[in-house]
Swiss-Prot record:
Modified residues (N5-methylglutamine): 150
Function according to Swiss-Prot or TrEMBL: One of the primary rRNA binding proteins, it binds directly near the 3'-end of the 23S rRNA, where it nucleates assembly of the 50S subunit.
Keyword terms, alphabetized: Methylation, Ribonucleoprotein, Ribosomal protein, RNA-binding, rRNA-binding
Molecular function GO labels: rRNA binding; structural constituent of ribosome
Statement: the UniProt record of this protein carries the keyword Ribosomal protein: yes
InterPro entries recorded: Ribosomal_uL3, Ribosomal_uL3_bac/org-type, Ribosomal_uL3_CS, Transl_B-barrel_sf
Gene (UniProt): rplC
Protein name (database record): Large ribosomal subunit protein uL3
Species name: Aliivibrio fischeri (strain MJ11)
Superkingdom of origin: Bacteria
Lineage, highest ranks first: Bacteria, Pseudomonadati, Pseudomonadota, Gammaproteobacteria, Vibrionales
PTM field: Methylated by PrmB.
NCBIfam families linked to this entry: L3_bact (TIGR03625)
Transport among keywords: no
Self-association state and partner proteins as the record states: Part of the 50S ribosomal subunit. Forms a cluster with proteins L14 and L19.
Length: 209
């Protein structure tokens, strides 16, 4: 089944009838408009392309304007694609709302994690720090050895070292849908989801449910 594109609003909590506090992330899912339908005959695979939200007219490029005009949909803030399974059919211009999750209990949420800039090995990879005293005066947060000597004479690819952290695509799996608010186009998902407030997130039915 396809997913939906939403916007992370923030976190709050709701209470059950027993008084148990549940931390939830609020995801606003505006109607996803189908801007293109891809088929095996035309594109080699079955998928739909969707857009959501809106974009200022002066921010829409001419190719984008032509693409949206051909589909007869309002220009959105981006384009996303979902593969279709056999038997699923959608028409260009159709709108997908948060109600598609009425029968879904678990979802996977994909977003862009918060950027942390250039970070050391302790923060980036949870390395242990070295002694604060006992003769150590320079290497408290240093990573230590990064390899051998002249054989192999290089640092292996993938070695955990300091570097850019965050701002990458992250998926959190098997999150529980606590509530679907169709009136306000909101999804209340238990726990935290990747990304900063206001960021785009993709919500799909869980693959491991």
């Amino acid at each position: 089944m396809i997913g939906l594109v939403g916007r992370k609003v923030g976190m709050t909590r709701i209470f059950t009838e027993e008084g148990v506090s549940i931390p939830v992330t609020v995801v606003e899912v505006e109607a996803n408009r189908v801007s293109q339908v891809k088929t095996v005959e035309t594109d080699g695979y079955n998928a739909i392309q969707v857009t959501c939200g809106s974009k200022k007219a002066n921010r829409v490029s001419k190719p984008e304007a032509g693409h949206f005009a051909k589909a007869g949909v309002e220009a959105g803030r981006g384009l996303w694609e979902f593969r279709l399974e056999n038997g699923e059919e959608f028409a260009v211009g159709a709108e997908l709302t948060v109600e598609v999750f009425n029968e879904i209990k678990k979802v996977d949420v994909t977003g862009t994690s918060k950027g942390k800039g250039f970070q050391g090995a302790v923060k980036r990879w949870n390395f242990r720090t070295q002694d604060m005293t006992h003769g150590n005066s320079l290497s408290h947060r240093a990573p230590g050895s990064i390899g051998q000597c002249q054989t192999p004479g290089r640092v292996f690819k993938g070695k955990k070292m300091a570097g850019h952290m965050g701002a990458e695509r992250v998926t959190t799996q098997n999150l529980e849908i606590v509530r679907v608010d169709a009136e306000r186009n909101l999804l209340l998902i238990k726990g935290a989801v990747p990304g900063s407030t206001g960021g785009n997130v993709i919500v799909k039915p869980a693959v491991k449910a």
